[in-house]
């Protein structure tokens, strides 16, 4: 908090110095009075307005009056030897920016060339800009779309919808002029936005575009275990990332243990990723925020996308229900793995006379949304998201009488069944309340589920009559149910202020574990049954309020200041948190901006895991009376530059601390005890710091990006180890290189090379055998003990790989686009470390041996856009 107030005082000091520059208006007036021998009559408050320019020699009085006051909101009138100054009336131009099919667009720049002020559309495509009365020329631009220039003569408040057409010549990613979402113009540090075009032109693992794997390539982000969808941002852990899908929080965002993320990029409209400089409207996690917005659907025509790849297929379709009034968007993705393995197992089972194996794995995710517009400024939408993974395995074996000297025939059955996933439903209203005020209210429900069961049945038969049976059955059920609302308001009193305020509420129902077991022994018709069960259940409510103001204090200084307040109640405990947020941007030159930010974040939900594999056995637990909420503080700052030759460069540093981190320790067990789980966790703290740099070149045919991260990530759990030690994913160096080339409108290719320092692992230094005392018998577990220097004491070999791919495009006579993609993962077959084996040397010392699993992996996909 002390750092926050120091930053505020510094900001006020800079603002005070900047306001002193407003005396330029007084000097300009004095100069014209002296040169033209006139007297100015005006309200003294007008002297605080920054002049549009300075008086020039060899100009008439009227010409210089236009130079000084043009676009400032000050009107002038010459009467004899007097110049009368008075404020112009101001009016608000507001509305929505949409594609020509009615789909709203996010982060569109609306810029007034007359006053040299502008704004961005929000997450619902809404904008509002207050301008002086009179004539204005507005430029509306967005990457990948044709720019629209609109001339206005404002004599009253005006509402309008602006439609943009997709560009047929510009390559997605090419810069547009006056892009106010560019880091050069925003205050936030560590923010990156993704459009659908950008997501679908990134490297695609197994030829399937993936949002999380695109984020993994950013500086300051570690991917964790190879091929999995881990996100370790600025030293944070995988559970410290807030995923929002149309405003609804998600807990499980992976398929197949992380091989695929749970986002179908065909339905994604925009993604905002924050790793520092968090605005006050976000909360609930401590490391990052991923705000995903999905399509509403085409209001005019039907169209869609179909894609089939090596392991999965995707389908997306959208169109009008009532033209220009109601639209729908539907997307589905499903894996093919069960269809591929079924014939293989059928052939294998035919070769076994005493064994039958049935295995099935499949996943799907479904996105559905329907939107109705009551008017141009009032709409309602209902969205549903469902994601599910399913794995089944059943092995039947028969052993004839006499096998291994058995008296009876034996029949064994082992069944394993696991499913996990998400379900979320959101009802959202969005509308314009006044020309300067818009509102958004959502009712949300989310459910996270993980369930697995195991059955082992051994039966013995004599002449097809069962004589005995042993059955063991285990089941585990874990759920989280959230229900609540989100209320957001956006108020733009002037072009220099954008105020956001709102409230979020969630009622949490946690069931971390519901464990049941059953053991049955039956002999000669007499059964002996043993039952046991356990359940953990928690209820909690979380309500937050926030306010933030994005302020343009001077032509060069921009500030985003806000406060996020949270009240959290769970059985037996109540917590509250005040989280200040401050981001400052200062325009050093036309081509460079200096930024700094300070943020505090709290987290009331924790994921307990004994691995880094994103397993469904991982479960979520709330903060309790014994486990306090996690808290992080982060300072970040850097310089952002637009250089000649289509180059851009960013350099950013950060320092982050985390208190009350949790670490799960049950001696290697993957399942959490249902009761008293709090005694199985350690509480500690962490710190991370580093420097990030990125360089990008964008041209119509060539795109090159390079990023480098130098970072340290440490943690301390005093009950486990008394000093600071490196985190598992303390990757000192990380380098990403990407190049994409467009040969023509039909062929484009890309290559991406990734390098990072190796992950950390723990290897014992020696093994000490306990002495055996005469006349005593040592238990088997007391034979000796391992001696460790410290946790994560070795660094595995460096990780690096090359991915390449090529797209072949063709447009049919009917206007359909066909895309063939061929990709190669790990092109030079680097066997990077996936896990570590500990080997004992001849001299008694130990060494870790890195084991790699993933060689070169080719893949393909076919996409049809219709």
Located regions from the model:
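Short, acidic, small-residue-rich periplasmic hinge/interaction motif at the N-terminus
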Residues: 29-36, 72, 78, 83-84, ...
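Periplasmic N-terminal accessory/gating domains of Gram-negative outer-membrane beta-barrel systems
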Residues: 69-70, 120, 146, 182-239, ...
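Short, acidic Ser/Thr/Gly-rich low-complexity loop/linker segments typical of extracellular
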Residues: 114-126
